[in-house]
Amino acid sequence: MKEYYTISEKKLPIIALRGLWLFPNNIQHFEVGREVSLNALNASLLRNSEIFICTQKDPMLENITKEDFYHTGVLASIKQTIKMPNGNIRVLVEAYDRAKIVDFVENDSFLEANVEVMEYDKTKYHPTDKSLTMIRMIISSFESLAEIIKKPLPQDLLGGLLNEEDPSSLIDTIAMLISLNDKDSILLLETLDMDERIELVYKFVIKEIEFLKIKEDIEERTNKEISDTQKEYFLQEQLRQIKMELGEEYDIEDTDDYANRVKKLKLKKDSEEHVLKEINRLSSMNPNNPESTVIRNYIDQVLDIPWNKKSKSSIDLKVAEKVLNDGHFGLEDVKKRILEYLAVKKMTGSLKGPILCLVGPPGVGKTSIARSIADATNRKFVSMRLGGVRDEAEIRGHRKTYIGAMPGRIITQLQKAKKLNPVFLLDEIDKLASDFRGDPASALLEVLDPEQNSEFTDNYIEIPVDLSDVLFITTANSQEQIPDALLDRMEVIRVTSYTDSEKFEIANRYLLPRQLKENGMDKSQFHITRDAIYTIINNYTRESGVRELERNIGKVIRKAVVKIVKDDVKKVVVNNKNLEKFLGSKLVLDDEIPREDTVGVVNGLAWTQVGGVILTIEANVMDGSGKTQLTGKLGDVMKESAMAAISYIRSNQEALGIKGEFYKEKDIHIHVPEGAVPKDGPSAGVTMVTALVSALTGRKVKHDFAMTGEITLTGRVLAIGGVKEKVLAAHRYGINKVFLPKENKRDIQDIDPKIRQKIKFYFTSNVKEILDEVLI
């Protein structure tokens, strides 16, 4: 202990101040309101008015223990007490010496302790030259401090400080006048060496001057920037300027968290800098500014992208084969091609290569095949419907400058998957459209091109997203409607129509059990016969897929449920005899096509987006002036086929046995029934020639034939598409003789062998061969 201190010990009541520090040689006012403090105050007044005053560590604590305040404080004397209207006592105290608690005294009413008092004797302290110099610097700096705050200290106080002969009193008084935090205050109280204490106060004064200069500069800049409408945000703006001056970020709720989360994503340098720049903009922006909401939404969207999150994808061909077989009946060629595709992916370890495009009519299982691929490769599955999409922004997103802007659906689906390598189904890619808002097909080019999609940039996100690990699969009903540039990037796998036997197996294995489960039934309560299922297939649906078939099975089961619940029936059996009670009258009758030989009526074969159909073409010839009329809502290509057919007949009139100048003396009317349904395509050419020649010659056409093929002016028959669907349509209607172009002979290998055996195929390269066979 220094020679200028005299140590004594006293038993004193304790008052702990909240947010206030008291130093020796100073007078201070404060209010006392807590019961423990009031009791300590009264005990002091009853003794000699001496009290130990210290500071509470946490000013928010109401009930304190001996561990909740600093044990170093001051010995003070109570000079005055005034009772306040709110019940508190206002106290005036004078602090004398530093003191610290030695041990506590048990007391239930107030805090009390044995305190070691360090009484200072100014006559025994002899400052060093360094300390004297520093004291002068403190006084000079304190005068500068008064000028900076532009609130001059009272002359009596300033004069008292300048004339102060006691260094201890001087520096303790100055410590009371400057802003010190708890750490600095307790350090100053605990420092007993006068030379060290002088040096500490000098540092504190210099620090206070620097702080006030910065504050003054900040206030000046802030006042210039704040307009009349921004005055209410004055405090937030000040805080922003303070943080900017310190080189720190302004923490608007969670900008620090944003920055940390972005850094953890390990983005490319340019991408990370771009997002951090937006976070910095947010940190320096008033939270009430509408643009801060836009930036916050943008950052949230970026963070929602699964940048480095990928499923642990594995390709096990045995598992893949089992998944495909369990989920799909038939479609053997499709399954084989998908297994080949997956095998190549596993061998190369790369997803670069053609994108699979599953083309086929609705309801044949294209979407479920894509789901099975996801299951087989242990990936998440997401899908995006492209039907009717006209706006490029649906793919690429809107720029965030627009109100309500959001990322495109590619990004949102990745966010939904929470993985960066899902199986991504682009459904109905042939239904894309375009208008003044852009061409979404062009936007998809970048998505589907393996050489480009590693740098896919959404207009909203603005930084590249790597799509190279995404397994894209597309579906379409018609290959012809897919834009050429997109088609060039895809490998087409045709998912053809189901045969009746395949539909039966699908219904029996999958649809029936699923509908029973959904309606709370089991096999012990419901049975439908084989013949009844075939009747539903042939007389209530007539579709390429099985969606309508499942709906009808569900309808039958629901009515069976009503019967069981209402009539207390234990089991319902559905057969051909009672099927109409469940489904009503047959929707597709067996006599839709000619069942006898007729003049001018021919069974054509057509392919639609719902599969193959019989397209009956009728031709009639009557006296007239050579007019030609086409009805049945025919498209331009089909009309041109009719014109080509007439030209062929005119040029071969004599060989065909047609007399007279029919093109001058007769009017020709070609009609295709179901006039409300649009029809188009070149494959009805041979059918029109046959119907016209029959009508012009009066020769009947054999009703058990069906035909398809494009006609040329010379009578050549050209190849067409959709052979499998067309042949299945003929089989459904009971037609077992089919004319096909010779070039399509290879296509019948795709047809079920059981059906091939039931149909006699005629392959022709010239329409004359058809006429010779079918005209009677």
Curated annotation (Swiss-Prot):
Domain spans labelled Lon proteolytic: 596-776
Top EC class, one word: hydrolase
Chain ranges of the Lon N-terminal domain: 12-209
EC number(s) recorded for this UniProt protein: 3.4.21.53
Keyword list, A-Z: ATP-binding, Cytoplasm, Hydrolase, Nucleotide-binding, Protease, Serine protease, Stress response
Matching SMART domains: AAA (SM00382), LON (SM00464)
Binding site for ATP: 360-367
PROSITE patterns linked: LON_N, LON_PROTEOLYTIC, LON_SER
Active site: 683, 726
Cellular component terms (Gene Ontology): cytoplasm
Gene3D superfamilies associated with the record: 1.10.8.60, 1.20.5.5270, 1.20.58.1480, 3.30.230.10, LON domain-like (2.30.130.40), P-loop containing nucleotide triphosphate hydrolases (3.40.50.300)
InterPro entries reported in the protein's UniProt record: AAA+_ATPase (IPR003593), ATPase_AAA_core (IPR003959), Lon_bac (IPR027543), Lon_bac/euk-typ (IPR004815), Lon_lid (IPR054594), Lon_proteolytic (IPR008269), Lon_Prtase (IPR027065), Lon_prtase_N (IPR003111)
Keyword set includes Cytoplasm: yes
A GO term, aspect molecular function: sequence-specific DNA binding
GO biological process, one term: protein quality control for misfolded or incompletely synthesized proteins
Induction of expression: By heat shock.
Subunit structure comment from the entry: Homohexamer. Organized in a ring with a central cavity.
Classification via NCBIfam families: lon
Function: ATP-dependent serine protease that mediates the selective degradation of mutant and abnormal proteins as well as certain short-lived regulatory proteins. Required for cellular homeostasis and for survival from DNA damage and developmental changes induced by stress. Degrades polypeptides processively to yield small peptide fragments that are 5 to 10 amino acids long. Binds to DNA in a double-stranded, site-specific manner.
Family: Belongs to the peptidase S16 family.
Protein name: Lon protease
Organism for this UniProt entry: Finegoldia magna (strain ATCC 29328 / DSM 20472 / WAL 2508)
Lineage, opening ranks: Bacteria, Bacillati, Bacillota, Tissierellia, Tissierellales
